[in-house]
Amino acid sequence: MRIAIYPGSFDPVTYAHLDIARRATRIFDRVIMAVFDRPQKRLLFSTEERLHLLRTATADLDHVEAMSYNTLTVEFARQVGACAIVRGLRAGSDFEAEFQMAQVNQTIDPGIEVVVLMAGRPFAHISSTAVREMASLGRDPVEFTPPVVVAALREKFAQRG
């Protein structure tokens, strides 16, 4: 069985993320959307909330599951028996950071490939940052993220008042 991980903060998950995961299942038998549990950035949603949103959003995607991890990404890939790390690129500006990370991962474990999928045309402009920004300004980002996420964003920003 060919397993890949698709790591990210998924804060929150967007249709762009789901598109990459869906397309990765054409290449791999199982895709694990791996939620990083200790990211360096401030997050809107907790790890548990992000996992819940991801699991709900991927419920209809065969061969996709969500898990959290708090180790180096390449070490998590090894732990779950993955042969590849999937990354999505939206624009050329994403390339440099992804290239550097791929080089680090290849140095740590040359047996784990990095597979980059270009964002599909309708999704290339979608980012979690833009989704959070829209929601913080009172606009429901229904075009960019699943309904469960829209509802969670509404609730989160209502709590912040």
Curated annotation (Swiss-Prot):
The protein's site described by Transition state stabilizer is found at H17
Q: Which residues bind substrate?
A: S9, K41, T73, R87
* Classification via InterPro entries: Cyt_trans-like, PPAT, Rossmann-like_a/b/a_fold
Which pathway does it operate in? Cofactor biosynthesis; coenzyme A biosynthesis; CoA from (R)-pantothenate: step 4/5
Cellular compartment(s):
Cytoplasm
List, in alphabetical order, the GO biological process terms annotated in this UniProt record: coenzyme A biosynthetic process
Q: Where does ATP bind?
A: S9, F10, H17, G88, L89, R90, E98, F123, A124, H125, I126, S127, S128, T129
Q: Which GO terms describe its cellular component?
A: cytoplasm
Q: Which UniProt keywords apply?
A: ATP-binding, Coenzyme A biosynthesis, Cytoplasm, Magnesium, Nucleotide-binding, Nucleotidyltransferase, Transferase
Catalysis: reaction(s): (R)-4'-phosphopantetheine + ATP + H(+) = 3'-dephospho-CoA + diphosphate
Q: Which GO terms describe its molecular function?
A: ATP binding; pantetheine-phosphate adenylyltransferase activity
**Record text on subunit structure and interactions:** Homohexamer.
- Similarity comment: family membership: Belongs to the bacterial CoaD family.
**Free-text function comment from the UniProt entry:** Reversibly transfers an adenylyl group from ATP to 4'-phosphopantetheine, yielding dephospho-CoA (dPCoA) and pyrophosphate.
What NCBIfam families has UniProt attached to this entry?
A: coaD_prev_kdtB, cyt_tran_rel
Q: What is this protein called?
A: Phosphopantetheine adenylyltransferase
